[in-house]
Swiss-Prot record:
Gene3D superfamilies xref list: 1.20.920.50
Protein name: Major allergen I polypeptide chain 1
GO molecular function, one term: steroid binding
Lineage: Eukaryota, Metazoa, Chordata, Craniata, Vertebrata
Keywords of this entry: Allergen, Disulfide bond, Secreted, Signal
Length: 92
């Protein structure tokens, strides 16, 4: 499994251990969705809503390009599937 996919799964696991409250604000869900399935421009535009510093935006683009290059479509679908299961889990 690729490093970026592992990070997404670790983030998801932390949600489950964080006291059982998996309510995630829609903005975070949108960020994660764009990070995994959006274009680099869409993701950078989303990041710019929170922090429009050039260095932050450049790092966001580099990270998104890296994820797109390293993760397969199947990896991304698997990560989204895990997140969907967490969002709908009765443990949350």
């Amino acid at each position: 499994m690729k490093g970026a996919c592992v990070l997404v799964l670790l983030w998801a696991a932390l949600l489950l251990i964080s006291g059982g409250n998996c309510e995630i604000c829609p903005a975070v869900k949108r960020d994660v969705d764009l990070f995994l399935t959006g274009t680099p421009d869409e993701y950078v535009e989303q990041v710019a809503q929170y922090k429009a510093l050039p260095v932050v935006l450049e790092n966001a683009r580099i990270l998104k390009n890296c994820v797109d290059a390293k993760m397969t479509e199947e990896d991304k679908e698997n990560a989204l599937s895990v997140l969907d299961k967490i969002y709908t889990s009765p443990l949350c």
